[in-house]
Amino acid sequence: MADNDDCRSGPTRRDYVKFGGTVLGGGLLAGCAGGGSDATTTTSDAVSTTETDTEEATETPDTETSDGSYSVSMAPVGEVEFDAVPERALTYYPVSADAAVAFGHGDAITGIGYDKELFGNTVDYYYDALDGVEFEWEELGRVTPASNPNALDRELFYELDSDVHFLDPCLLRSPSFDWTEDEVASIAADVGPWFGNYYSRTNADPPEPCRDRYEHYTLWEYLGHIAAVFREEERYRAFRSLRDDLVARIRADLPPASERPSLAVVADTGGTFWPYDFTGDGYLWAHLRPFGMQNAFAATDAQTGSDGSYDYEAMVETAPDVVLRYWGTALGDSFRSNREEVLSNPLADEVPAFRDGRYYPSGNGMQGPIMNLFQLEMTAKQLFPERFGAWPGYGDGESYPEIPEAERLFDRERVTDIVAGEF
């Protein structure tokens, strides 16, 4: 077992949260270098609802010692030891920020990643529908410099002084950020440990030297590990029960696969559409997988551009019954104006989804417990309004639209109670 002392020359300045255990062989991140693609394609067949949309109800126990410290194990970081529950946490992606809020530790968040307003809008869209659940993101720090949102500033990690960093160290060693092993190790030793598993988002391969120790997790397995860091396993189980009940309700009322509409999930700009393969593996599609939908792009011979995009004519040939705009919920007026432009195109009547007005904003796959509940409900109503009630529209674009209580697919009050610790 490689202790964290092998990775630093002196003691960490943080005495109550420390790194320990086995991490990718010897040393903190021995050889965790190189690239790994998690790009999606559009060639997969439709996924049956009998496959991996049903997640195993696994526990992620922490291991406690006689002095009250505890450890949590997860690939690729190995066993991470904590002397106390983290009071300061960096949540780079919405999945960990939403988890921190859901598990009652939203106040511990010190910083977030990339554009703060886009990040804030991503989670506020759902939290606005819950009484008493808030995410005060405006004053949070960020580790991406304003001049380059696709980079990371190591000095900002020191300034934020977080007890734990919910980021995958293998991602930092990839070409996306290109940190050295020493740079990754110094943050863990001097500030706080890394705790993340980025490549489970699409079950992609991590950088080559990380692969022997890497493991992919479902969304709710991953969330269970985050809950264990905060020692909030009971809150996790309460949320997990809500999610399982919601998925069971959805699956019980789905039509046969042959009667389900064909679906396209896209990003689009100016009449150019970039498709996503939502039938692939990974927690990025945890809000779509339970529906067992056919990917409209998998069955088309329409030609793509050199960048894999489709033009409007190709959308006519693909003829999806429903089109979802990935991450459209965070775009506000931008999505509304884009939707009007798409639906007013002279070719709109030749695309079933556009002709019928079934072009909707969808959510973000980097989702935590609360986001996952809302995004499952939203998707159910967008795909099967006759079975789950109609999607009421985008509304003001700032908040999840009001849905009559009788048409809600999960209990909002139950969510707020769990966040408040009343369960």
Residue ranges, per PLM feature:
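Alpha-helical, coiled-coil/dimerization segments enriched in small aliphatic residues
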Residues: 276-306
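Extracytoplasmic substrate-binding proteins
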Residues: 180-271, 362-423
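Solvent-exposed loop/turn segments at secondary-structure junctions
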Residues: 94-98, 115-118, 165, 170-175, ...
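Short helix-initiation/N-cap motifs at beta->coil->alpha
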Residues: 75-77, 140-154, 301-312
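A short, structured surface patch at a secondary-structure boundary
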Residues: 88, 93-193, 293-296
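Sec-exported extracytoplasmic/periplasmic mature domains
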Residues: 94-95, 101-105, 159-162, 170-171, ...
